[in-house]
A protein has these predicted regions:
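The Walker A/P-loop phosphate-binding site
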Residues: 2-92, 109, 113, 244-250
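P-loop NTPase motor core
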Residues: 39-43, 48, 54-55, 92, ...
Length: 250
């Protein structure tokens, strides 16, 4: 039989402050509302090549050095490809990052139980499938939602809450449809936009249950990854002085 939870008066409920993981990547933390909420699920979308995987590898690296375990599950790149990028953009790689080259969400769940991470990164959601889902190819709205619901259960587990960040590729029409459905499910939606300036990236929060929407953080894509532009005014002023005007900076 179903167990009904007690009905409470709103005035009797004790409000709780969100428990967050601070990454130390200033613009990322600011756009997120002060860091990653521990029982949250976030989707980050962009066109291919915008820097999603690079930024999240930096996020994983940063919090791993603060003692948090991270599972980075990739259905797009091999573990050696991920290691090559890490060697290029990171220093002193932490032992707290586990890389899983996988397209089975069921196997990700098993790995999560074994490793017990604080953060799970899925790159990208369109490459994963669930065995018990209706027959459909990876990237279809059906598979995308089944995988996302499984990740939601992991994130919102009362006994062991975890943060989950999902990468979503903006490519085919049906994959975009799956992402739009995901926006209603997740807590936070982040979009990376590449400007006319080849180096400049904007990280925008179009939805955030734990912070302000419409926040924009600025990054510069360099050989060492996505560098947080902690003083955008100074950055844009320098660009103007150099005669290299940036669209959207006026």
């Amino acid at each position: 039989s179903l167990t009904m939870k007690p009905v409470k008066k709103l005035s009797d409920i004790t409000s709780s402050k969100s428990d967050r993981i601070i990454t130390g990547i200033n613009e990322f933390d600011r756009v997120m509302g002060g860091g990653i909420v521990k029982d949250s699920i976030t989707i980050i979308t962009a066109r291919p090549g915008a820097g999603k995987s690079t930024l999240l590898l930096q996020v994983a690296h940063s919090i791993a050095h603060k003692g948090h375990k991270v599972v980075y599950a990739s259905g797009e790149e091999s573990d050696s490809q991920i290691k090559n990028r890490a060697d290029r953009i990171l220093n002193n790689i932490s032992d707290n990052i586990w890389v899983l080259q996988e397209t089975s969400m069921d196997n990700v769940v098993h790995a999560t139980r074994d490793i017990d991470p604080d953060l799970i990164i899925i790159d990208s959601i369109q490459t994963f499938t669930m065995e018990n889902a209706l027959p459909a190819r990876a990237g279809s709205p059906t598979q995308t939602m089944e995988c996302a619901n499984e990740l939601l259960r992991l994130a919102k587990d009362d006994k062991r809450p975890r943060a989950v960040i999902i990468v979503g590729q903006m490519t085919k029409a049906d994959e975009l449809a799956g992402l739009r459905a995901l926006e209603h499910l997740v807590d936070t939606v982040l979009i990376i936009e590449a400007n006319s300036d080849e180096e400049l990236r904007g990280l925008i929060s179009s939805k955030n249950r734990f912070g302000s929407t419409g926040e924009t953080g600025f990054f510069q894509m360099t050989e060492k990854g996505m560098e947080s532009i902690d003083n955008p005014s100074e950055y844009f002023m320098t660009k103007r002085e150099d005669g290299d005007l940036v669209s959207g900076s006026t």
